[in-house]
A protein has these predicted regions:
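Sec-dependent N-terminal signal peptides
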Residues: 4-12
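Functional-site microenvironments in short loops/helix caps that host divalent-cation chemistry
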Residues: 25, 61-62, 68, 73, ...
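Short, compositionally biased
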Residues: 16-136, 140-141, 161, 188, ...
Length: 317
């Protein structure tokens, strides 16, 4: 049986269906901007093999360039700030949704690792502890007796391996950790803590799906207890949604300390980076969903607060 890897500086989190905010707001936030690339029709590879492009998977183009990665004001694993250069790339406007993942499964017959193992990581509120819940899957995030996953919410209970399989099918890949942070910063060397600014909320209006209240008495000031529809909290300056909170997101890289950081972590190619933070309680608080916030988990682990978005290489426009 797989082990849930709970070894990061962050307290690893969870995700699923939740209370709905204004339908009008969600609809407004789902409208594509002029710098969003829509890719809804199949393409052909140079080998003349069909490459499927997932439906409604709008992507945002970044020219690439250099930026200062990390934060001197963040957690120890975010230091030191160091210069990184990324090449031009596209990244999905939003995390992959339940609906998009369902099409992948229907076309390919793919089985996630949670389905193969027969369980997946869920936080048990009654017992106030994590558990491997039998039957918890991407389509039944709280197990067979729980509600169905909602189509427009980010897919969860997917391992890094599952995410890579989807990305390969869609003719894409997972973003590198540097690409993810560059996109979260809207391609700028901004000093803002979050993808949207410096505050989690202003006058009771929340900018992301995050945890409120103590772990044993959760509140829903942002309108959701668990996951929210992608885009429900608007976009960053670059036109991306959910670049902080809602669900943790897998990155392509294995986890390692930044250059010059003596963090006592042995590099393991099977331990992958996750970014974004999620809707669930985190001991590191707001630092988990800061643009520089980073954590890790094993490549075969699936949790109900972890999903992903895709990226792909691009030529400079």
């Amino acid at each position: 049986m797989k082990q849930i890897l709970l070894i990061s500086v962050f307290f690893l989190l969870f995700s699923c269906s939740g209370q709905k905010k204004s339908e009008e707001q969600a609809e407004k936030n789902s409208q594509p901007e002029s710098n969003v690339k829509s890719e809804s029709s199949p393409e052909k590879s140079s080998e003349s093999q069909s490459v499927v492009i997932a439906p409604d998977s709008k992507m945002v183009y970044f020219d690439g360039g250099s930026f200062m990665m990390g934060s001197e004001n963040g957690l120890p694993n975010e230091k030191p700030v160091h210069k990184v250069t990324v090449n031009p790339f596209y990244i999905n406007k939003s995390p992959v949704t339940v609906s998009q993942f369902r099409q992948f499964v229907e076309v390919t017959g793919f089985k996630t690792e949670a389905e193969k193992f027969g369980d997946s990581g869920v936080f048990n509120f009654e017992q106030q502890q994590w558990q491997l819940l039998p039957g918890a899957t991407w389509y039944k995030p709280f197990g067979p007796n729980g509600p169905d996953a909602e189509d427009n919410h980010p897919v969860t209970h997917v391992s890094w391996n599952d995410a890579v399989a989807y990305a390969n099918w869609a003719g894409k890949r997972l973003p590198t950790e540097a690409e993810w942070e560059y996109a979260a910063r809207s391609g700028k060397n901004s000093g803002e803590k979050f993808s949207w600014g410096d505050e989690v909320s202003v006058d009771g209006n929340y900018f992301a799906n995050t945890w409120q209240g103590p772990l044993d008495a959760p509140e829903t000031k942002d309108g959701y207890l668990f996951t929210s529809p992608v885009g429900a909290f608007g976009e960053n300056e670059a036109g991306l949604t959910d670049m902080g909170g809602n669900v943790w997101q897998w990155c392509a890289n294995h986890y390692k300390p930044y250059p010059g950081n003596d963090e006592p972590v042995s590099e393991d190619p099977n331990v992958k980076v996750i970014r974004s933070g999620s809707f669930f309680y985190d001991t590191s608080g707001e630092d988990s969903f800061a643009v520089s916030g980073r954590s890790m988990n094993s490549h075969e682990t699936s949790l109900f607060n972890t999903g992903f978005r895709c990226a792909k290489d691009a030529e400079k426009e």
